[in-house]
């Protein structure tokens, strides 16, 4: 069984760039997305769609 650090699909936290501290948790494929993930998602604190960046 693969260890957590070498998993192909690790669990990552996406943190809001609006500075609200709101986060989403998702999985990503390291082979297809080796860079930090950036997704545009809804932040309910500011009630807008903002960029969410992967934090390590």
UniProtKB/Swiss-Prot annotation:
GO terms for cellular component: cytosolic large ribosomal subunit. Gene3D superfamilies: Ribosomal protein L33. The keyword Ribosomal protein applies. GO terms for biological process: translation. Coiled coil: none annotated. It comes from the Bacteria. It holds the Pfam family Ribosomal_L33. GO terms for molecular function: structural constituent of ribosome. PROSITE patterns: RIBOSOMAL_L33. Keywords: Ribonucleoprotein, Ribosomal protein. InterPro entries: Ribosomal_bL33 (IPR001705), Ribosomal_bL33_CS (IPR018264), Ribosomal_bL33_sf (IPR038584), Ribosomal_zn-bd (IPR011332). NCBIfam families: PRK00595.1 (NF001860), rpmG_bact (TIGR01023). Belongs to the bacterial ribosomal protein bL33 family. PANTHER family: 54S RIBOSOMAL PROTEIN L39, MITOCHONDRIAL, LARGE RIBOSOMAL SUBUNIT PROTEIN BL33M. This is Large ribosomal subunit protein bL33A. The gene is rpmG1.
């Amino acid at each position: 069984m693969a260890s957590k650090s070498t998993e192909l699909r690790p669990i990552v936290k996406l943190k809001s760039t609006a500075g609200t501290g709101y986060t989403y948790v998702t999985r990503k494929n390291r082979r297809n997305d080796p860079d930090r993930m950036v997704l545009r998602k809804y932040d309910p604190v500011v009630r807008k769609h903002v960029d969410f960046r992967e934090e390590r």
